[in-house]
Amino acid sequence: VQSLERVFLISGHSNDSRAKAPDYFAIFARMEKKTEIPVSGRQIVMSGIRPTGYLHLGNYFGALRNYVRMQEQYDCYFMVADWHSLTTHPDTKELKNSVLRVLAENIAAGIDPSKACLYVQSHIPEIAELYLVLNMLAYKGELEKTSTFKEKVRLQPENVNAGLLTYPVLQAADILIHRARYVPVGKDQQQHLEMARNFAQRFNHRYGDLFQEPEAFNFGEELVKVPSLDGAGKMSKSENQFATLYLADDDDLIRKKVMKAKTDTGPTVKNSVKPPEIENIFQLMSLVSTEETVKKFDADYGNCTIRYGDLKKQLAEDMVKFISPIREKAENIYHDTRFLAQVVEQGSAKARKSAKATIELVRQRMGFNYF
């Protein structure tokens, strides 16, 4: 119990990383009460993240920030997809640390385990059973045509395993095991969601109605794409690591990365359009800086008096103020293995109750209830 009191604030953000610890007794009391899946009438949302690296600013603004809001309005199932990681990272030596790190960073970013079901994929064996069933409804030709499979074959020709080919089938099992209504996905995963809809349709047609067809969660204008610091696309784990700001980066590394952000020689015509690399910096600033700060530098750019060194210094300090509280909270949570074990235990209990109910219905529809 004492170790729980050392963990910092798990939801919301405060620039005071030494903020008073929350009442973890109350948190776990709420978690205990919600072990039974509530019949709330709320729509179910399911999403997962692979434990293949630290979370970055793009993960936060592109997903986590919205997840924090969603947990107040939906029954949310947020999964650490450790089985999925094996398709590209078969060495499991660091898997435990990676899973714990992702859990800690999710909680530090605001996911409340007393409100959302936070669990690990491999702790829910019913997913594997549904995966097997759905594989009988998937076809080699359609799986080989998926853009992500073709891209992985190009990137890792020495390891084209069956897990890569059937990756969309496992994703479908992740979603359908909870009979989720909404799935927050990026454009790169839209094809996989459509396949999940197809598998649901095929099951319903062959064995009887069971699954609703999952839909992409529409964030509308709230969906944010965070640009990389080198001006080449969005922040990503797989691209230029020095152009990506991680939630685990220390203050000096944040400053170093931001100061190396790509710029041009500066504007020479008043009120000219910003080139992409400069627009990227302003977009990043709009995420973490005050409105007054953004307006000040925007005006400087418009009248050709902007100094990029000052712009990047300001952005660096604002990034430090934003990231450092999350990093410090995540570090404390990560090292409190007792707390994380309790979170996973509670999340697994909720997720398994939902999964078992679905699998029982699957077996009934398919006629596996022989006696």
Positions of the model-derived regions?
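Short, positively charged and aromatic/hydrophobic N-terminal segments
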Residues: D23-R30
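N-terminal Rossmann-like or analogous alpha/beta NTP/dinucleotide-binding catalytic cores
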Residues: E32-A173, R327, E331
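Divalent metal-coordination and catalytic microenvironments
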Residues: N106, L134, D188, A232, ...
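Short helix-capping/linker segments at secondary-structure and domain boundaries
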Residues: K140-E144, I177-P184, S289-F297, R327
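Internal, conserved structured core segments that host functional sites
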Residues: R154-F203, Y207, P227
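Conserved nucleotide- and phosphate/pyrophosphate-binding catalytic cores
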Residues: Q191, R197-F371
